[in-house]
Curated annotation (Swiss-Prot):
Other information: The name (minor fimbrium subunit) does not indicate the abundance of the protein, but is derived from the greater length of the major fimbriae. In strain ATCC 33277 and strain ATCC BAA-1703 / FDC 381, major fimbriae are 300 - 1600 nM in length and about 5 nm in diameter. In contrast, minor fimbriae are only about 80 - 120 nm long. This length difference is observed only in a small number of strains, including strain ATCC 33277 and strain ATCC BAA-1703 / FDC 381, and is due to a loss of function mutation in FimB, a protein that restricts fimbrial length in other strains.
Annotated source species: Porphyromonas gingivalis (strain ATCC BAA-308 / W83)
Protein name: Minor fimbrium tip subunit MfA4
Site label Cleavage, positions: 53-54
Primary site of residence: other
Annotated Pfam families: MfA4_C, P_gingi_FimA
Quaternary state and interactors: Component of the fimbrium tip. Minor fimbriae are composed of a structural subunit, most often Mfa1, and the accessory subunits Mfa3, Mfa4 and Mfa5. Mfa4 is required for Mfa3 and Mfa5 insertion into the fimbrium. Fimbrium assembly occurs by linear, head-to-tail oligomerization of fimbrial subunits. This is mediated via insertion of a C-terminal beta-strand from one subunit into a groove in the N-terminal domain of the following subunit.
Encoding gene per record: mfA4
Lipidation (N-palmitoyl cysteine): 19
Sequence similarity: Belongs to the bacteroidetes fimbrillin superfamily. FimA/Mfa1 family.
InterPro entries linked to this entry: FimA_N, MfA4_C
Domain of life: Bacteria
Length: 333
């Protein structure tokens, strides 16, 4: 009899414990929701580089503010949160954990289409404030009059999205923030016919020049299905008219070197042996973006002018320039 009483007592304890586990003080569906984010790596590719990932520098991963939009299942009625500090109306931002804790509960949230936008300027914020539907995000953009480095610079506009059922899990984990810009790196090794002793003025190579051709001015929060062109070049002069082209600078020769700029290498005799240029640019759906470089030739006296004058090297960029891609080229001229 004692054995049966002991068994009944143990069974009662287990049932009571089970009931307490299934009935916490606050119902599961009423717990506040959380969203964690991460900055996506660059996709690094190019003619002489295998496909790889690169997380980028600290400046390329920098987040200064966030704008959250939680649309309902139909893509409408967004709940919005603008975050500039650790606390904000409606929640808390934990930058070390890359996590946002919202006061909104699971039952209030339900299933949501969640968009996270980072590094929002005043113009983009005003446009996001007016967003009523998910499709409206494709109209929100930042315009840069000179869309290359140093005007396109950190902190970069980023965005990411996921659909999530907060009733099933109060944590939406790892929303990837993707930079809305691309990066181009061009490393040029010069053959002997271009290895001159240059005229250097304030660190720049006076005879070496370049220009960006058909770069797009618009940086979209969410890229339209087909992005319309709004193009500009860094100089109006078309080869061989290079007076207004940019002279080759030495910003990448400094230490620590910036993430974008121009640089060069001199040998022991003071001759230019290599050139380097790194710039950010906006995505494009149509081909035509190009980097043009004017290179002075060594004057060996065998040809009359202008045959030994500058030559043009043209690097066509990919037919489609994709956001968050790092295009790296190693070329010999």
């Amino acid at each position: 009899m004692k054995k049966y009483l002991l068994y009944a007592s143990l069974l009662t304890s287990v049932l009571l414990f089970s009931c307490s586990k299934n009935n916490p003080n606050e119902p599961v569906e009423d717990r506040s929701i959380e969203i964690s984010i991460r900055v996506d790596d660059f996709t690094k590719t190019g003619e002489a580089v295998r496909y790889e990932r690169n997380q980028g520098s600290a400046a390329e991963r920098l987040i200064t503010n966030l704008y959250l939009l939680l649309f309902d299942q139909s893509g409408a009625n967004p709940a919005k949160y603008y975050i500039t500090g650790n606390t904000f109306t409606g929640g808390t931002w934990l930058p070390d954990d890359m996590k946002v804790k919202l006061d909104m509960t699971q039952s209030e949230a339900g299933e949501r289409k969640v968009y996270v936008v980072a590094n929002v300027d005043n113009a983009v914020k005003t446009a996001l404030d007016a967003v009523a539907n998910e499709s409206d995000l494709q109209t929100v953009k930042r315009t840069t009059a000179m869309p290359w480095s140093t005007d396109i610079a950190s902190p970069f506009l980023m965005s990411g999205n996921k659909t999530h059922d907060f009733l099933a899990n109060r944590l939406l984990d790892n929303v990837p923030l993707v930079r809305a810009i691309a990066k181009v790196e061009l490393n040029i090794s010069l053959s002997e016919k271009f290895q001159i002793v240059p005229i250097i003025v304030n660190g720049s190579l006076s005879e070496f020049k370049f220009r960006y051709v058909n770069f797009d001015k618009e940086t979209y929060v969410v890229k339209p299905t087909t992005k319309p062109d709004n193009l500009i070049s860094s100089a109006n002069g078309v080869w061989p008219q290079i007076t207004d082209w940019t002279v080759w600078g030495a910003s990448l020769n400094t230490s620590p070197a910036p993430d974008a700029g121009t640089g060069y290498t001199l040998d022991a005799n003071g001759k230019v042996t290599a050139l380097r240029i790194v710039t950010y640019l906006n995505e494009r759906d149509s081909k035509g973006a190009t980097v043009e470089v004017a290179l002075p030739r060594v004057d060996d006296g065998t040809l009359p002018p202008p045959e030994f004058g500058p030559e043009l090297y043209r690097l066509p960029l990919p037919d489609k320039i994709l956001r968050n891609h790092w295009y790296k080229y190693e070329v010999e001229i």
